[in-house]
């Protein structure tokens, strides 16, 4: 939401001067102290409960349908503990002057304002890590109740109290959220610049769109700039293709809007898709393409983007961060990290830093994680699920020890071996992949639905794509299994040793949990 100046506050016809306006519910009276901002659905003000002196934020909605929608989602989210799940605490709803008022706890500033306060200086990894952990925890909680936020952007992630609890954050604004069970195919949700490929191209959506949005936010914090265009949908899609690669052909065939952004060549022996030029997009849609130039060409550029101040330890941490981003920014939502798998990623567990516990860099990283609520850390089992152990390629990639800057030789090996972090080795998954895809991938079922014709507006003939032709999530491991002569034996070995490796990973998580809690106590 945009900031409103004092002059605009005084001239507004909907509000009196903030110092004199009182909003009354059935049980409480709130004195408005400041106008915060205005959006499409309403205005937000800061206020004080006149009876208890509690500071609150009040969202005053213009439209009743928007109010009903947001209340419905807030009731669903109220099943969660707002502190443990890092969502804004909703207090009450009331009517005042025919307008619906929603009262929330008062928070500090949002992430966009934080970067403004830092004068455009990006966050470092020790600051990004606790934010990533908290938001992954939030989305794991939302996933458990079937809620998709859909509006993840820096403005909707707020610091609780940055002075007392640095980088403690909460997620706000459920005004355009929806339930997993709702039919949302073709809905243009998510802000441009944080919009996932499946939303842009018109495929069915899932909780995976929030994981994409999270990846964009973490990248935004590290760059101190938007990674993709925020005001041109074409440039947003082209930026994704330039940085991450083009969506697979079967993915494009399934999209309602794919023909707006891509051209399908059917005249060659090997037909395929290619992204349109700006002029082709403009002539086909009538929408003018805006200029955009990104900061990086690929995610790997992030490793050396900023000066390295802590040698190979920091480089290793950057590689882990890039690995996390690659998991969150997978174009295919079936391959994208889930919240639980994200929480088990080495960048969050910091297992790659274990051999350098006395390093000032590592101690600073541990200190920054002290903002997390780790009272039950030792008892958590979800973070090290079998799914992560069997399927997560990002764990293996982030565990590779980087080369030393000075000598080019590898630094001392970590006691955490790559094989202990469970690289993907489940060749048997490929055999049953068709069933898995058919059961779990909502957009596959509708892959035969063609895009609307640009010229006539009529639907073209159904695509010949079949479920069994689509690449399953584990197709890379399936290809490897065909090349290895002893694949069956290797699979059996992996299955025999997996429980021990999962147990070791759990012990490492508990070890780090105890360390973080000790550091947290030292700094109290």
Task: State each model region's role.
Residues 96-105, 112-113:
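A conserved loop-to-beta-strand element in the N-lobe of protein kinase catalytic cores
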Residues 131-132:
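Activation segment signature within eukaryotic-like protein kinase domains
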Residues 43:
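Conserved N-lobe ATP-binding subsite of Hanks-type protein kinase domains
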Residues 335-376:
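Regulatory extensions flanking the kinase catalytic core
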Residues 248-324:
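C-terminal lobe substrate-recognition/regulatory segment of protein kinase catalytic domains
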Residues 143-161:
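Catalytic-loop of the protein kinase fold
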Residues 81-92:
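Conserved HxN/HPN-centered segment at the entrance to the catalytic loop
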Residues 155-191:
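Activation segment/activation loop of eukaryotic-type protein kinase catalytic domains
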């Amino acid at each position: 939401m945009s900031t409103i100046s004092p002059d605009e506050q005084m001239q507004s016809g909907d509000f009196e001067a903030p110092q004199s306006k009182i909003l009354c519910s059935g049980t409480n009276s709130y004195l408005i102290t400041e106008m915060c901002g205005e959006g499409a659905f309403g205005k937000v003000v800061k206020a004080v409960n006149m009876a208890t002196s509690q500071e609150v934020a009040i969202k005053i909605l213009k439209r009743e349908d928007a109010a009903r929608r947001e209340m419905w989602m807030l009731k669903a989210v109220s099943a969660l503990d707002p502190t443990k799940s890092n969502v804004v605490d909703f207090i009450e709803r009331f009517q005042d002057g025919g307008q619906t008022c929603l009262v929330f706890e008062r928070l500090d500033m949002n992430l966009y304002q934080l970067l403004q306060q830092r004068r455009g200086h990006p966050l470092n990894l020790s600051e990004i890590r606790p934010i990533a952990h908290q938001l992954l925890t939030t989305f794991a909680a939302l996933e458990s109740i079937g809620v998709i936020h859909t509006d993840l952007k820096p403005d909707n992630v707020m610091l609780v109290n940055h002075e007392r609890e640095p980088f403690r954050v909460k997620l706000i604004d459920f005004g355009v959220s929806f339930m997993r069970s709702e039919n949302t195919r073709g809905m243009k949700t998510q802000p441009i610049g944080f919009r996932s490929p499946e939303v842009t191209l018109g495929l069915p959506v899932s909780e995976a769109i929030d994981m994409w949005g999270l990846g964009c936010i973490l990248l935004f914090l590290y760059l101190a700039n938007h990674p993709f265009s925020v005001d041109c949908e074409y440039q947003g899609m082209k930026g994704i293709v330039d940085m991450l690669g083009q969506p697979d052909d079967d993915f494009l065939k399934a999209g309602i809007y794919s023909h707006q952004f891509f051209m399908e060549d059917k005249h060659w022996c090997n037909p395929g898709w290619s992204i349109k030029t700006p002029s082709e997009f403009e002539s086909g849609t009538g929408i003018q393409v805006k200029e955009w130039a990104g900061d990086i060409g690929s995610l790997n550029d992030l490793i050396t983007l900023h000066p390295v101040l802590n040698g190979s330890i920091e480089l290793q941490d950057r590689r882990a961060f890039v690995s996390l981003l690659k998991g969150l920014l997978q174009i295919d939502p079936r391959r994208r990290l889930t919240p639980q798998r994200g929480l088990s990623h080495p960048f969050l567990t910091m297992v790659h830093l274990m051999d350098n516990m006395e390093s000032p860099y590592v101690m600073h990283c541990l200190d920054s994680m002290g903002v997390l609520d780790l009272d039950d850390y030792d008892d958590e089992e979800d973070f090290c699920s079998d799914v992560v152990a069997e399927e997560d390629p990002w764990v293996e990639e982030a565990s590779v020890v980087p080369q030393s800057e000075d000598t080019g030789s590898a630094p001392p090996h970590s006691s955490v071996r790559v094989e202990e972090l469970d690289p993907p080795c489940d060749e048997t998954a490929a055999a049953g992949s068709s069933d898995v895809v058919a059961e779990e991938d909502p957009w596959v079922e509708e892959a035969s639905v063609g895009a609307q014709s640009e010229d006539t507006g009529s639907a073209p003939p159904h695509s010949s794509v079949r479920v069994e032709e689509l690449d399953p999530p584990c197709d890379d491991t399936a290809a490897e299994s065909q090349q290895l002569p002893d694949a069956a034996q290797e699979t059996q070995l992996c299955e025999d040793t997996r429980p021990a490796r999962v147990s070791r990973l759990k012990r490492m998580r508990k070890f780090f949990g105890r360390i973080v809690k000790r550091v947290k106590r030292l700094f109290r």
